[in-house]
């Protein structure tokens, strides 16, 4: 089953090693059947503690889709890359948002706010009923 993954990589800070290792990671992804590869460079930062005698590192986030069976083989390939200090691969969960619930909740909050304003000011502001608001939202 194809899943969407998000991986964070920490490379050595040297420019040449970083570029070479990043290309090696991308080639490995393609080799193991990854699709929709999106790469984002986060930046170079000082590390809180030395990792493999390195005080600085470059962070890269790569999103990709891959079969779950190929992931273990890909991880074993990552362990062989010397200038890769750390990595973390997470399954990216995509959830659908129920907009009807949001509209209802927003209407209730709107109605509650108007009721509070009516109590404070003493004047009456008309609030549409839920069926009237549904008609308005459909238009």
Swiss-Prot record:
Keywords: Ribonucleoprotein, Ribosomal protein, RNA-binding, rRNA-binding. GO terms for cellular component: ribonucleoprotein complex; ribosome. GO terms for molecular function: rRNA binding; structural constituent of ribosome. GO terms for biological process: translation. It holds the Pfam family Ribosomal_S6. Transmembrane segments: none annotated. Gene3D superfamilies: 3.30.70.60. Binds together with bS18 to 16S ribosomal RNA. Belongs to the bacterial ribosomal protein bS6 family. This is Small ribosomal subunit protein bS6. The gene is rpsF.
